[in-house]
């Protein structure tokens, strides 16, 4: 009798897992590793290429002039802090969204996505206003060199318009990541990098009869790339992936106060920690910025290498948040704990290899 109850209980457990998208049998460790590495490389590459869109300006301006390179590097420190905050908003969305995806409950997922988008747009608006009203004051945080300030102000005057588009892109990509759609992010970033580098080549140096705009040309390239990112992503989302989510433009006008409160409660600590990390990194430029243009330029190159290597860790955490969130949403706590132990081993290996 006890054996029959045990078998019945097991069958019930298997049935429950099936409802949430798992196989009737416990997935093997190898299957879990396979699922992890099907997403991980794409997320690492996507993060690398996303960083490269702004870093391409730094690299190509290095051949144009030291002051232009240093001016762009100073502005991109603001972008880095902003990106850290948007990453926190996106990670919070993935934490909640992947759980609802595991439960196959799409309605609350869409409402969480709407809340995240509202906070992202608010953040972009605040930053836009600050750098529009206090452009020189913002740049003086990083340097007092008049030539660098002049170049940085030209760059910031255009690059500030990218903040809105970047926020929309990052929140939409986090929404897709919640439901295990990651390939589009990498392809989108590659497109943005190609567009940015092409326009930089034409407008920074004035090739093929185009005007030589210097640092303004680099900013125009980045702005164009960010706008194209949003356009392509919106078309993809509402024509293809939107069907999987049941997502429509009107969904972003409706938020759930209870879900928004839960989202903010979880995301607020990440906003603080990510923001502090971004500020900590920017402070290095602040210190060097009161030295020479050469010091800022050298730090820009070193920081570029560091951020590219750091992408391996960012990709790992992004992948883990999706997979653990989905497992939590399935309601199988023992399986979730088992998966977390597997991830700890993976993180150790990734950390050693990255080092």
Model-derived features: where do they sit?
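Residue-level hotspots within the lipid-embedded alpha helices of multi-pass solute transporters
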Residues: 47-51, 84, 124, 128, ...
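Residue-level signal for short hydrophobic patches within transmembrane helices
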Residues: 33-52, 56, 78-85, 161, ...
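Structural signal for membrane-spanning alpha-helices in multi-pass inner-membrane proteins
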Residues: 131, 174, 200, 204, ...
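Helix-terminus/linker motif at the lipid-water interface of multi-pass membrane proteins
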Residues: 48, 52-70, 139-146, 202-213, ...
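Residue-level signal for transmembrane alpha-helical positions in Major Facilitator Superfamily
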Residues: 41, 52-53, 89, 130-134, ...
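Short alpha-helical transmembrane segments in multi-pass integral membrane proteins
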Residues: 1-43, 97-164, 212-267, 324-355
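Short runs within selected transmembrane alpha-helices of multi-pass transporters and secretion channels
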Residues: 90, 159-178, 185-196, 218-234, ...
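Small-residue-rich hydrophobic transmembrane alpha-helices
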Residues: 69-132, 166-185, 285, 296-355
